[in-house]
Amino acid sequence: MASSSSSSSSITIITTFLFLLLHTTAKKTYIIRVNHSDKPESFLTHHDWYTSQLNSESSLLYTYTTSFHGFSAYLDSTEADSLLSSSNSILDIFEDPLYTLHTTRTPEFLGLNSEFGVHDLGSSSNGVIIGVLDTGVWPESRSFDDTDMPEIPSKWKGECESGSDFDSKLCNKKLIGARSFSKGFQMASGGGFSSKRESVSPRDVDGHGTHTSTTAAGSAVRNASFLGYAAGTARGMATRARVATYKVCWSTGCFGSDILAAMDRAILDGVDVLSLSLGGGSAPYYRDTIAIGAFSAMERGVFVSCSAGNSGPTRASVANVAPWVMTVGAGTLDRDFPAFANLGNGKRLTGVSLYSGVGMGTKPLELVYNKGNSSSSNLCLPGSLDSSIVRGKIVVCDRGVNARVEKGAVVRDAGGLGMIMANTAASGEELVADSHLLPAIAVGKKTGDLLREYVKSDSKPTALLVFKGTVLDVKPSPVVAAFSSRGPNTVTPEILKPDVIGPGVNILAGWSDAIGPTGLDKDSRRTQFNIMSGTSMSCPHISGLAGLLKAAHPEWSPSAIKSALMTTAYVLDNTNAPLHDAADNSLSNPYAHGSGHVDPQKALSPGLVYDISTEEYIRFLCSLDYTVDHIVAIVKRPSVNCSKKFSDPGQLNYPSFSVLFGGKRVVRYTREVTNVGAASSVYKVTVNGAPSVGISVKPSKLSFKSVGEKKRYTVTFVSKKGVSMTNKAEFGSITWSNPQHEVRSPVAFSWNRF
């Protein structure tokens, strides 16, 4: 009979062996880059060739031909290693990256009482097709009404797929295409759909995709509101543009293999604009599936708009930073949803709310804070509150960790009758309104500190919550949202990101009937519209505006459209003061707002644009520490000649400047501008310098004689003696102006790489 110790050892060895066996044989989705031109003539298609290199045909998920050269497959690590070593045609293999979603009044705030106020532009945007990669679409939304829309443009090569609870007949002359891509998601979920709520079709059961697509190009819907809030006409930026949706995001996120397949298809379908309100962490461009797909789109004249991320105000948190992508941060509107907490000590605290249920009456209720079963009760995490203490009371919950609306649900389930969600330092003074399941308001950090102190110091603290509906013409606005991700750009610090900010706080747009406005399973309410916040909301604003610019200037490249939006952006709010940051109410800077807040009226006629060709982007890539194979992965060419590479990535003809001294005292960049204004135009330069940097521009005057004429100028940046080499940043600007136009470029200065 074996001893107990030897039996234990045997069990440990067997358990370890089984763990290692499972670990080494566990399958994952891999993206495989292939030398496209190496396909043997014996294979009719690349699909056939790729399949021949796999042990099983069923392992192949997608074949990529446009946005990427290669395929994705479901393999274990041994198979992946074997595949990489089996052929010189296999250039790279990497795991499927996971991305996440970056989750009305807007047209008026942007000055779009009609599309740019140009009557002919509305009809001309009929030919623009905006592709939205997201959670799908709710086609029955009134925002997809196609009344008076002309026939679908002949360039459209896409289709409307049928699927679970989705008939292809649901598409029309407004919503012209709908597809879904789920192979990467299914493989990550064990080969199937893990959630009963998933719809194996383009149908949106999340709401996010319907919200973003209707923000970009929703038809005008009168008498729209969210439970009585934000009442008026809801419409997208480009109300007459067509929408094509590509469902790539599922319950566990958005997988790179699915995103690449959707971008591949969208480019071939004939979209003019791609809108992606999703992203992940930073990666080299040759491993960034969005950047790779976006390069192919740009090369074919497709404008790509991406959200900057919701990881602000953390420094260097910005996502989607490739220079051929428009990276969009978020700002506030001049609309608010005020709510108040009348305290028992006579003070009135101001906050916001979208609560629409039965009010609290006139009797104040007792306030409690941090009363629960765990140390996390201050955050109101699930199961953290003691119902015997919070029942019948208003609970103060700190913002953070779990979803804001979930906190309200936790309070309600514990028997609480109301909630005040108080910001901490992470969110500062930013106020985001939510449609809680019980009476609730959100307050900023300073107000929250007063509230927490009141609860702790008063023997019987009380409050009464009061809701005041919708208020317009709020000042100051816009303000940079605290959640909006910040620069500097960690992949290429010489490129300033984000590019611009747009409306991204408390945005009204269409919604899915499959889910309540909070997104919680226990929310039984159904609404046609919802109010959401995030750079997910600001991104489609710019996508729609890009569509309008494309309609007005069909000859403009994606880089020219991007330049027009950036150089005409404004940096003063509606009180004529510099933009502020909601995180701490301090002055904002280009790491937070990029070139500024978009101004579509001015973008229509920018005067000058900074255009960038595909060859210039390749010279930019050559200036990075990438191998030729890495660059080929992005540009999809048989070979790349880097003999004319830029000496510095900052030499790219970008509409903004990010100067990294990195031990040097002098940095010199040359830019080229193209005249898109009056034929005979003269521009003079104005420099707004930084305390530690001298700036000189030569020449100081640019004279144009014709439309399309190009002129160059050189900027010399000199770090003043005695400047300490720290992580500090300073900012300035360079503006070319004449009586009709101001073409402004922000400048960011840093001395050390982040």
UniProtKB/Swiss-Prot annotation:
Main location: secreted
Any GO MF annotation of the entry: serine-type endopeptidase activity
Domain Inhibitor I9: from-to ranges: 29-102
Glycan attachment residues as annotated in the record: N35, N223, N373, N641
Occurrences of domain PA (ranges): 367-452
Peptidase S8 domain segment(s): 98-604
Propeptide: 27-102
Keyword Transferase carried by entry: no
PANTHER family found in the cross-reference section: PROPROTEIN CONVERTASE SUBTILISIN/KEXIN
Protein family according to the UniProt entry: Belongs to the peptidase S8 family.
The name this protein goes by in its record: Subtilisin-like protease SBT1.8
Taxonomic lineage from the root: Eukaryota, Viridiplantae, Streptophyta, Embryophyta, Tracheophyta
